[in-house]
Amino acid sequence: MKKDIVLCGVGGDGIVSVAKIISDAALSLGLNVKQSEIHGMSQRGGSVFSHLRIGSDPIAADVIPQGKADIILSSEPMEALRYLPFLSADGWVITNSAPFVNIKNYPNIEDVMAELKKLPHCVAFDANDVAKKVNARSNMVLLGAAANYLDIDFKHLEDSITRIFSRKGEAVVNSNIAAIRAGKEAK
């Protein structure tokens, strides 16, 4: 098993938390994990991305070469476009279709989505809307949408959420699990 995943978005969207959950689930299965993350501006709105490599064999480097990512998981559509050079020819993009407009010259969202829809494997939906319906965060909804492409049993993702968020209380754990379940059904 080998998965190279680029997670991207903007500061405050919970991309680092999603990477932590996937890493924890993979480690619980005895898989090897390498991760590299870059935090943009320390305030909400700066670009954030993480390279996450998972495999049954040892992993030498934590950075995914361009053209080799199996998945790009993005909390923001323009950020998904920014990291497309990393996507393999048969890779999947899973992205929130709702933009985070934090710059004056943000491109027309219809143009951004049209570019993403040209990809052979793209799941794009309004994760913010799904999250509101279950009173949760969109990052967890996106994790649920990506679950079918991770080659990690869904139960292991739920168990990782329980381990990671249990100190925040049962309500937070239940909210996050409800969100990944809603994301798995969304598309």
In which residue ranges do the predicted regions lie?
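Active-site cofactor/cluster-binding pocket
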Residues: 1-187
